[in-house]
Amino acid sequence: MIEAIIYESNTGFTEKYAQMLSKKLNLPSCPAGKMKKTFSPGIEVIYMGWICDKRIRGLEKAQKYLRIEAVITVGILSPTPGFIALLHQYNDLMDLPVFYLRGGIRREKLSISQKLILNLMAKKLAAPVKRGGLDSISNADYQVVDSILHSNSFVKEQNLEEFLFWYRTQTEVNPYNKPVI
Ligand SMILES: Cc1cc2nc3c(=O)[nH]c(=O)nc-3n(C[C@H](O)[C@H](O)[C@H](O)COP(=O)(O)O)c2cc1C
């Protein structure tokens, strides 16, 4: 039975989603840094973590202490086909169910080195513009570049729907998880 939502958030977007989900599922949400003080080892949880350079932050540590039933990860990129498969590959997720949500950028909350990494990401995404002009970048990539340069949020409650659908199917199999939706 899933008992809690554990999350790691750097600038607040993952935390915001965790709070939304906590309300919808009537489950407590807890920052990963407090999981050991708050929960017994081995309980079943949903893990939510922001993506930093393709890696889901805090996941490995949480996996050592808790039993993770599903992972929700929050990033800035617009997902392309194969995106989830790549996340599986980079994070050794085996057969864990993984869901991706778009968060946002708050430049004022980032360290200098984090800004540098993001600037490089933006430069790479915007590279085709140098060769072929503005028409050569997709709208989705343009939005990401713009968010990286000026901050932006993609957080909305509807983004949780795919996960909620999965969660409901799980609770039909296991009636002890009773979501309050
Ligand atoms: C240093 C750095 C690296 C990042 N790498 C990725 C990445 O590889 N893929 C992605 O989709 N988003 C990436 N992002 C974007 C964050 O995952 C995104 O801003 C997310 O919403 C942050 O969530 P938080 O506010 O909970 O920390 C990166 C952000 C930073 C600062």
Question: Can you say where each PLM-predicted feature lies in the sequence?
Answer:
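Structured loop/turn residues at secondary-structure junctions
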Residues: S9, W50-I51
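FMN-binding flavodoxin-like domain, especially the glycine-rich phosphate-binding loop
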Residues: V45, I51-I181
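Generic detector of short, locally flexible boundary/turn motifs and exposed helical patches
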Residues: E8-E15, M35-F39, A62-L66, Y142
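A short beta-strand-loop structural module common to alpha/beta enzyme folds
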Residues: L27-G49, I72-G75
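Short, charged N-terminal beta->alpha structural module
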Residues: M1-C30
